[in-house]
Every structure is written in structure tokens, then in C-alpha cells.
Design a protein with these regions (language model features):
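C-terminal low-complexity, charged extensions that often adopt amphipathic alpha-helices
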Residues: 3-4, 72-103
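Short acidic amphipathic segments
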Residues: 29-50, 54
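Short glycine-/aliphatic-rich beta-strand segments at the starts of folded cytosolic domains
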Residues: 1-21
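Short beta-strand-to-loop capping motifs
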Residues: 17-19, 53-57
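Ser/Thr-Pro-rich, acidic low-complexity intrinsically disordered regions of eukaryotic RNA-binding
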Residues: 22-29
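Charge-rich, low-aromatic oligomerization/scaffolding segments with amphipathic character
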Residues: 57-74
């Protein structure tokens, strides 16, 4: 899987990935993250092409092992799965409330 490093520090890396990070893909990533305890957090950006990984200091190689561990066929299936709704954030609630008031 070809990824592009956009930013990196001692315990965080932001990558551009070749798959869309939909809600179903996010759930799949969280499930697979359990096998890599040194990865502490996965953050998917709203543009669905960038992902940030937070990891324990000195374990940046575990991020690349994690990405190699992911199955491409499963990722493709999850990208097409629109039955899983994204988590509702407080901003989404406020925006929908304002929209209903205006309409």
C-alpha cells in the first residue's frame, strides 16, 4: 500500500492514504488497532484521504507494520459500505439545529 508522509514528529505521523476513510473503514481500523497496542490513537480527517496515528515514542515502525497488516480487499469492501453512519459530533448537532430553524 502506497502512503505519503505529510508530517511526522516523535510520537505522531500524518499520512495520505490511497483509500477513503469512511465510517466503516474507521471501525475496521479501530478493530485492527487492537493488535498493535503501541498505536494509541487513529484520527481520520474529514477529507477522507488523510489519517494521523499517535503512537508511543520510538514505535513509528509499528504504524507501517499496521498498514501492511491491513487487507486491501477488506478496505475496498468497507469503502463501499454506507450502512454504517459516521459518529455525530456536537458541531453536526448544532449545524442541523440551526438549519432546521432557518428552514
Amino acid at each position: 500500500m502506497k502512503v505519503t508522509i505529510k508530517a511526522q514528529s516523535k510520537n505522531r505521523v500524518r499520512l495520505e492514504v490511497p483509500f477513503r476513510c469512511t465510517a466503516a473503514v474507521q471501525l475496521y481500523l479501530e478493530e485492527e488497532k487492537r493488535l498493535f497496542p503501541e498505536i494509541t490513537q487513529i484520527i481520520c480527517y474529514k477529507d477522507e484521504k488523510h489519517i494521523a496515528f499517535t503512537f508511543e515514542t520510538g514505535h513509528e515502525s509499528s504504524v507501517y507494520r499496521f498498514l501492511d497488516h491491513l487487507e486491501v480487499t477488506t478496505l475496498n469492501e468497507k469503502q463501499r459500505d454506507f450502512t454504517v453512519d459516521a459518529q455525530v459530533t456536537p458541531v453536526d448537532i448544532v449545524v442541523s439545529h440551526i438549519y432546521r430553524k432557518l428552514v
